[in-house]
C-alpha cells in the first residue's frame, strides 16, 4: 500500500497545475448542462510542502477528471481564506463560505470538544494500534461528531505523533518537565496536561517560536517531527525526546452547503475520493516522518527515544487528565480509542 501511495505522490508532483480557475467558489452544484466549471475552495492549515497537500492535490485532480471538468478545486494553504485564523476556517466551513477543508482534530476540538479524544496523551501507542482504531470504531465516531458539527467528513488522515524539544535537559521522566517554559497548542487539554506534568505552558503564534527559542524566551516546544524539522526548530534547540505523546488525526470535510448541492452519484464520488485522498495523505505523512527522523543526524541535537518503561511513568502521571475530562469526552468515547477507567 505504501508503494502505491508513493507512486501516486510522484504522479501528483508532475500535475502541478490541477487547481487553476479562480472562479467565484463557494457556490457548489449548478446547472449540470452548463459548460462553465464550478470552482470549489479547499482550505488547509499548512503550506504546499506538507503531506496534507498530497491528499488535497489527489482529491482535486481526481474529482476534476471524474466529473469531466464540471468541478475544479483551488487549494488554499496556510488558512489564507480565514486570514490565518485556524478556528475561523472551521467556522467558514460551517457557514458554507469554504467548500472543502482539511484541519487536524486538535483544532476541531475548539468547535466540538469530543473530537479531542484521539489526541489524549499516550492513548494509542503505535501506528498499528492507530490504524486498527481509526479504520474502525474510533474513526466512525469522529465522522459522526463532524457531521453533528455542521460539516460532512470525507476522510481522516494524520498529522502524526507529537514530540518535544528543549534547551535545558534531556526529558526522560515527568520530573524533567518541571519548570520548563514550553510553547504548546492553545487548547485547554494541552495546557492542563503540561501544567499537571509540572511545566510552564504558554501559547503563542507558531511564527514566533523560532525567535523565542533562539533568544531564550522559551525553553522548548512540542510538535510533529516533520514540522520540527521543516520549520527549522531543530536549528535552535539542544534536546529532542521522541515520546509519541499525542496522536493528531487530520479531518477532511465538505460543507453542508456543498453536500446538499451534489447529486447522489456525486456524493458517492466525493466520499470515495475523499477516503482515497486521505490514504495518500497518511502514507505521505509516514514517509515524511521517516525522512525527517533520518535528517536529525544533521543537527547538533541530542535525541532521546523513550523506552516502554519510561513511557509507562508518563502514562501514570497523566491519569488525572483523563479523570478531569471523563465527563466532557465520555467514557464510551474514550473506550472507542482504547482507554478504560
Language model region names:
Residues 16-20:
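C-terminal motif of bacterial Sec signal peptides marking the signal peptidase cleavage site
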Amino acid at each position: 500500500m505504501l508503494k502505491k501511495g508513493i507512486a501516486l505522490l510522484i504522479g501528483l508532483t508532475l500535475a502541478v497545475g490541477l487547481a487553476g480557475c479562480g472562479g467565484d467558489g463557494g457556490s457548489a452544484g449548478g446547472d449540470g448542462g452548463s459548460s462553465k466549471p464550478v470552482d470549489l475552495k479547499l482550505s488547509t492549515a499548512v503550506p504546499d510542502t506538507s503531506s496534507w497537500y498530497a491528499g488535497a492535490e489527489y482529491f482535486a485532480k481526481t474529482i476534476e477528471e471524474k466529473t469531466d471538468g464540471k468541478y475544479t478545486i483551488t487549494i488554499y494553504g496556510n488558512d489564507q481564506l480565514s486570514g490565518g485564523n485556524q478556528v475561523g476556517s472551521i467556522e467558514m466551513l460551517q457557514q458554507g463560505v469554504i467548500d472543502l477543508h482539511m484541519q487536524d482534530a486538535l483544532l476541531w476540538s475548539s468547535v466540538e470538544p469530543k473530537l479531542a479524544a484521539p489526541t489524549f496523551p499516550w492513548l494509542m501507542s503505535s501506528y498499528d494500534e492507530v490504524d486498527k482504531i481509526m479504520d474502525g470504531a474510533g474513526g466512525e465516531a469522529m465522522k459522526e461528531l463532524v457531521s453533528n458539527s455542521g460539516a460532512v467528513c470525507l476522510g481522516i488522515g494524520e498529522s502524526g505523533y507529537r514530540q518535544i524539544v528543549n534547551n535545558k535537559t534531556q526529558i526522560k521522566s515527568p520530573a524533567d518537565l518541571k519548570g520548563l517554559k514550553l510553547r504548546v497548542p492553545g487548547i485547554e487539554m494541552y495546557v492542563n496536561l503540561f501544567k499537571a506534568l509540572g511545566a510552564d505552558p504558554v501559547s503563542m503564534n507558531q511564527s514566533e517560536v523560532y525567535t523565542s527559542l533562539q533568544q531564550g524566551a522559551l525553553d522548548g516546544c512540542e510538535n510533529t517531527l516533520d514540522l520540527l524539522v521543516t520549520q527549522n526548530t531543530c536549528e535552535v534547540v539542544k534536546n529532542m525526546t521522541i515520546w509519541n505523546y499525542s496522536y493528531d488525526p487530520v479531518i477532511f470535510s465538505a460543507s453542508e452547503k456543498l453536500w446538499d448541492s451534489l447529486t447522489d452519484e456525486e456524493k458517492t464520488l466525493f466520499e470515495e475520493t475523499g477516503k482515497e485522498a486521505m490514504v495518500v495523505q497518511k502514507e505521505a505523512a509516514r514517509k515524511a516522518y521517516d525522512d525527517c527522523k533520518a535528517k536529525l543526524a544533521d543537527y547538533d541535537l541530542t535525541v532521546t527515544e523513550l523506552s516502554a518503561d519510561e513511557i509507562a511513568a508518563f502514562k501514570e502521571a497523566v491519569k488525572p487528565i483523563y479523570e478531569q475530562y471523563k465527563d466532557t469526552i465520555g467514557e464510551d468515547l474514550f473506550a472507542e480509542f482504547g482507554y478504560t477507567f
